[in-house]
Each structure stands twice: as structure tokens, then as C-alpha cells.
Design a protein with these regions (language model features):
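Alpha/beta enzyme core
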Residues: 1-64, 80-87
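Acidic, glycine-rich active-site loops and adjacent beta-strand->loop/helix elements
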Residues: 7-11, 40, 70-73, 96-99, ...
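Glycine-rich phosphate-binding loop at the start of an alpha helix
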Residues: 20, 73-76, 103
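Glycine-rich phosphate-binding active-site loops on the catalytic face of alpha/beta enzymes
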Residues: 36-38, 85-102
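Histidine/acidic-residue-rich catalytic or RNA/ligand-binding cores of hydrolases
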Residues: 48, 101-108
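Small-aliphatic-rich amphipathic alpha-helix that forms the alpha element of a beta-alpha
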Residues: 67-94
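Short glycine/serine- and small hydrophobic-enriched flexible loop segments
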Residues: 81-84, 111-115
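A mid-to-C-terminal "edge-of-domain" accessory segment
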Residues: 111, 117-235
Length: 235
């Protein structure tokens, strides 16, 4: 049995004693999971520690779950912090789908727990499929995938500036916090009005175009690309 304590966090702030009594009663009656819900999405990360200190007096952390909404843009952070504090279950959705501002984004929660905090989650062996799953869900729902989504967005590992691209080619860690392939994503080197020769050379190599002896033409080609971008073209 899973008991979702709707509005728990707001209820606790209004009446701590009553809120604790409610979840204790459910647990004592046989509920295996007590899920604390931030239904209005207004709870902030710094509030969690004191609340869990009270809750764990009556419910073991191994039987606690959380369910955060994203109305203050803290759902993912709150979920990660809850796990760090000992909670064993996180409810959420892929791509943060949900009512109003959405729910905790399980893509970001899983990637951060596994890659940043070293948790041995069941998703660990399949984390490199998370980008394709994220995009498939958007395709099924006929939604435009957000380019700037952390980890799985098409722009998450995109580089435009010539200096950036030159540095990334020498040491990816200079401008990438993880290896894109660890989440099934890929590096994107963009040719734009911010580009240097490194961008163009990389793009030509990608298409297996031989540039030997043609280095002088790269500058004029780069200028052409920049002029075209000012007219609305993208490369």
C-alpha cells in the first residue's frame, strides 16, 4: 500500500503536529510507503532538512517517498536533496511533464544521482538510453523537444564559439561537465557568426571533405557562412 500525503508540506508548515499524526496513522495501519507531496510546488530545498528530522521520528526513511511539483522551479533539486537526506522513493515524470509548471523531471533526477552523486540506481546500466527515451516521449505526445533541457537537449552539449570548440577538441572537460554519450546525447559543434576556423574545419572533417592545401579558403568560407546566417540561415 502506498499512501500519498497530498499537500503534506504545506500542511506541515500550517500544523506540524496534525500532519505528522496523519502519516503516522497511515503507516501504523499498514501502508508500506508514505509519500510526502508538495502539491502546490512551493517548498524550497532549505526547508527539507528540518521537516524530515520530524518525519523520521515516526516513519523510517526507508519507507518514505516524495512527490514534488515545479511551481518554484525546485522540484528536481528538492527530489535530489530528499534522496541525499535518506528518502528511498522519488515520484516524477519524464521531461517534467505535469499540471501547471510540471513535476520533478526524472531525467535530471536520475542523471544527477548517478553521475554526480554516485548512487547505484537501477537506471544506471540504461542511462545511455535516456536521451532517446526523452525525445521519443515528446514525439509520441507531438511536443517540441526543448533544445536547452539539461543532459538530453540538443543544445546541452552544443558549442558555437571558435575558442570553445578548439578547447573542447583538446579537452572536453573544459566546456562539458560530463561525457555526452553517458546519457546517450552527442556533442554538437555549430557553425555560426561566433565561429572561428575550428568550427569550419571540424564540420568539413565530419563530412569527410579533404581540406589539405585549401586552408586559405576557410577564412573566406567562414565569412560567407556568417553573412548567410545574418540572412536567417543556420548551419
Amino acid at each position: 500500500v502506498m499512501f500519498d500525503a497530498e499537500h503534506f508540506f504545506d500542511g506541515y508548515k500550517s500544523n506540524p503536529k496534525y500532519s505528522i499524526e496523519v502519516i503516522k496513522t497511515a503507516f501504523d495501519a499498514g501502508a508500506q510507503w508514505i509519500v510526502l507531496c508538495d502539491t502546490n510546488g512551493g517548498t524550497l530545498p532549505f526547508e527539507l532538512n528540518n521537516i524530515f528530522d520530524d518525519v523520521k521520528k515516526v516513519i523510517p526513511l526507508t519507507n518514505l517517498g516524495v512527490h514534488f511539483h515545479n511551481d518554484t522551479d525546485n522540484a528536481t533539486y528538492n527530489s535530489i536533496e530528499s534522496v541525499r537526506l535518506g528518502v528511498k522513493q522519488v515520484q516524477g515524470t519524464f521531461n517534467g511533464l505535469g499540471e501547471r509548471c510540471g513535476n520533478s523531471n526524472l531525467v535530471n533526477v536520475a542523471a544527477n544521482l548517478i553521475l554526480k552523486l554516485g548512487y547505484n540506481c537501477k537506471l544506471k546500466k540504461k542511462l545511455n538510453k535516456i536521451t532517446s527515451i526523452s525525445r521519443l516521449i515528446d514525439e509520441i505526445l507531438n511536443r517540441q523537444s526543448l533544445r536547452n533541457l539539461p543532459f538530453v537537449g540538443s543544445a546541452a552539449f552544443a558549442h558555437k564559439g571558435g575558442l570553445h570548440i578548439s578547447a573542447v577538441e583538446k579537452d572536453p572537460k573544459s566546456y562539458e561537465h560530463i561525457d555526452p554519450s553517458s546519457v546517450g546525447n552527442e556533442r554538437l559543434l555549430v557553425v555560426s557568426n561566433q565561429s572561428g576556423k575550428s568550427n569550419v574545419v571540424n564540420k568539413l572533417k565530419k563530412f569527410k571533405i579533404n581540406i589539405k592545401g585549401k586552408e586559405k579558403k576557410i577564412s573566406s568560407f567562414l565569412e560567407l557562412v556568417k553573412n548567410q546566417e545574418s540572412l536567417g540561415y543556420a548551419y
